[in-house]
């Protein structure tokens, strides 16, 4: 198995845990079928299945109802870096330089996407296209059905870590948006984000301003705005059509690892062990959630249910249960925390287990 330069996190144990926040908050079940750490997880649109990608080179499908493993997806020749789950298909990418599409009912591999020459870091599925970013410094667009490359995006001087896509119809008033076939935004360890025309592969804009690697990004397509998070501890807002930097969000004390945009609010998770909430339009910080014991590597806003019981998934470290960030009426912020690996550079994070919590909103 090749060495690991990936910025994606690793787990110390290949276990997935589910538990409740009531009482002592002990785990209700432990699913330890993986033989290596869990690098990523994806929840199906209907919430009934969970997909995990592991250091052991496999992905597994789980029932969220009982925690049972529904299918083993095996075929990759190295660790799985990222995974994405839809209703009928699962997608995984790996350090073996390939992407695979799977049948979620049978576990059968339906398609192998070959073309990248180094580790594939991220994938994104939209409009019957699959987009990928790799350590080979390229991003690529593929036909989901045929597994063939339809476009290559070259220009970054270092590896591509993060992706976001906007369809032409999501860009009202954007010049030549339809001819461009939509816009792909990529973030790289070269410190830039780039905006690409999907149809032609040309670079529309280069977003320069960060002084560290761009680790995460989200798009607000109605306003043509991209938000990027970096190892320089800042979040920056950009006009993706003009390339203009609109504002800088400064308060984090460590790399910004993950972003979520909800209802004109930007949520950010950082290596400084906090999640912060910002007003997207002004950059004003309106709230800080500082209950985490380790770096926050992923977060997800989840709307509440009629019973105010929200199932959440998070990573903890060293067997410690992840504490709740806070209580939200009718909603919650799901987060995943990681402990930084002891290395000279800020390149790796270690996780211990995946847990499921039920957090009830405060009246």
Where are these predicted regions, by residue range?
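Conserved strand-to-loop turn within each blade of WD40 beta-propeller repeats
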Residues: 53-56, 93-96, 133-136, 187-190, ...
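Terminal intrinsically disordered, low-complexity extensions flanking WD-repeat/beta-propeller proteins
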Residues: 293-295, 302-363
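Short loop/turn segments that connect beta-strands within beta-propeller blades
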Residues: 64-66, 104-107, 144-147, 198-201, ...
């Amino acid at each position: 198995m090749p060495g690991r330069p990936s910025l994606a996190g690793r787990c110390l144990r290949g276990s997935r845990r589910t538990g409740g926040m009531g009482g002592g908050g002990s785990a209700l079940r432990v699913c330890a079928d993986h033989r290596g750490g869990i690098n990523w997880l994806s929840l199906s649109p209907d919430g009934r299945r969970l997909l995990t990608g592991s250091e052991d080179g496999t992905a597994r499908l789980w029932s969220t109802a009982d925690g049972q493993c529904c299918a083993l997806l095996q075929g990759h020749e190295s660790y799985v870096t990222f995974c994405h789950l839809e209703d009928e298909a699962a997608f995984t990418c790996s350090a073996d330089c390939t992407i695979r599409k799977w049948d979620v009912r049978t576990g059968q591999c339906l398609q192998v996407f070959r073309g990248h020459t180094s580790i594939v870091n991220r994938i994104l599925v939209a409009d019957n296209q699959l987009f990928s970013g790799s350590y080979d410094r390229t991003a690529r667009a593929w036909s989901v059905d045929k597994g063939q490359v339809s476009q290559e995006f070259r220009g970054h001087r270092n590896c591509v870590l993060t992706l976001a896509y906007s369809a032409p119809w999501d860009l009202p008033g954007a010049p030549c948006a339809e001819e461009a076939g939509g816009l792909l935004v990529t973030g790289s360890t070269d410190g830039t984000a780039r905006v690409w025309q999907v149809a032609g592969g040309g670079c529309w804009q280069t977003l320069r301003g960060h002084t560290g690697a761009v680790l995460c990004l989200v798009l607000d397509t109605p306003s043509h705005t991209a938000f990027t998070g970096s190892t320089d501890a800042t979040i920056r807002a950009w006009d993706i059509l003009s390339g203009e930097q609109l504002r800088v969000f400064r308060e984090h004390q460590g790399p910004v690892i993950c972003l979520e945009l909800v209802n004109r609010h930007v949520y950010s998770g950082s290596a400084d062990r906090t999640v912060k909430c910002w007003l997207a339009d002004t950059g004003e910080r309106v709230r800080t959630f500082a209950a985490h014991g380790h770096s926050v590597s992923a977060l997800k806003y989840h709307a509440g249910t009629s019973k105010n019981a929200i199932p959440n998934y998070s990573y903890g470290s060293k067997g410690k249960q992840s504490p709740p960030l806070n209580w939200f009426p009718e909603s919650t912020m799901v987060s995943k925390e990681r402990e930084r690996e002891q290395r000279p550079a800020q390149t790796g994070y270690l996780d211990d287990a995946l847990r499921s919590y039920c957090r009830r909103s405060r009246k």
